[in-house]
A protein has these predicted regions:
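N-terminal accessory regions of nucleic-acid-interacting proteins
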Residues: 1-102
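Active-site flanking residues adjacent to catalytic metal/cofactor-binding acidic residues
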Residues: 107, 223, 262
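Conserved beta-strand -> loop -> alpha-helix junction used to position metal-binding or nucleic-acid-contacting
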Residues: 218-229
């Protein structure tokens, strides 16, 4: 259910009340919402909320669970408000972003892994990269797939070999990270793309592997597609890339092979399905 109201009181570390139909009604926030929104909930704040219709007992209080906030603001002066959060403004910004970026690079990395018997001071490095470059309509401009030799720990571990289903073929195709960096940087220089990834880990890992190899930061224009989904749909839990693909396509993916090019192609599909869904 949805409700627009003024906060009547803030109680404890996760409750607030409003006056609804002449009576005091309690609402509670789960931990993820407390961290994000509780600091804005003061007496007199204007809230638009989505909540559970049936109250439950929490800390001896019957309260409705907040599913998500739609808007939070506070009055300022006579006719103005300070807006702390507005889901529709966020959604408009996301629509503007996904409709305007061009060209678009979808990228995924696979990393070397700590072995079954721990290697002292081991650091993960990128050992495989899948890249798909498209225009704003999804037409493919370029596809690349690199296997990369790790530098600091030059052997791909048995655990990584098994997890990634590597054979001697993949090992024979591997190039140095510096060679990969040179080729990748040239593509970035030529096209200056927005780089779409699913989650923060790929961004972090590219920067880390560049540092290991003393390569300058490419200062890419990263867009976290997972974060766009979380913000647009106001999700409590982060969805997986493959589960979103299955949701959008209403079909089942074959068993995941941990192949960076396949994952980059799935990321492309999810981006354009997301774009199609939110821009109508």
């Amino acid at each position: 259910m949805q409700l627009t109201a003024l906060v009547h009181s803030v109680e404890g570390d996760s409750f607030f009340t409003v006056i609804k139909d002449g009576r005091k009604v309690y609402f509670y926030l789960q931990k993820n919402l407390v961290k994000k929104f509780y600091k804005y909930l003061n007496k007199g704040a204007y809230v638009v909320i989505d909540y559970e219709d049936v109250p439950v007992k929490r800390k001896n209080v019957c309260a409705h669970k907040i599913n998500h906030f739609i808007a939070i603001s506070v009055p300022k002066y006579r006719y103005n408000r300070v807006v702390y959060y507005d889901l529709e403004v966020i959604r408009d910004g996301i629509r503007d972003l996904v409709s305007s970026i061009n060209p678009i690079m979808f990228i995924d990395f696979e990393m070397n892994m700590q072995d079954y018997q721990a290697i002292p001071n081991f650091e993960q490095e990128i050992i495989e990269t899948g890249m798909v470059l498209t225009n704003k309509d999804g037409a493919i401009i370029k596809i690349k797939h690199w296997y990369i030799k790790p530098t600091k720990f030059p052997r791909i571990t048995k655990r990584a070999m098994k997890f990634l289903h590597y054979t001697n073929y993949e090992l024979s195709k591997a190039i140095s990270f510096r060679q990969f960096y040179k080729e990748f940087a040239q593509i970035v220089k030529e096209y200056n793309p927005y780089v779409i990834v699913w989650g923060k880990s790929d961004i972090t890992q590219l920067k880390k592997t560049c540092q290991i190899n003393s390569c300058p930061d490419l200062k890419l224009r990263f867009v976290n597609l997972l974060q766009l989904h979380t913000n647009y749909y106001n999700l409590k839990n982060s969805p997986g890339l493959f589960s979103m693909w299955e949701t959008y396509t209403n079909s089942k993916l074959p068993e995941q092979k941990h192949n960076s090019l396949e994952d980059a192609l799935v990321t492309k599909d999810v981006f354009f399905k997301f774009k199609e869904t939110i821009i109508k």
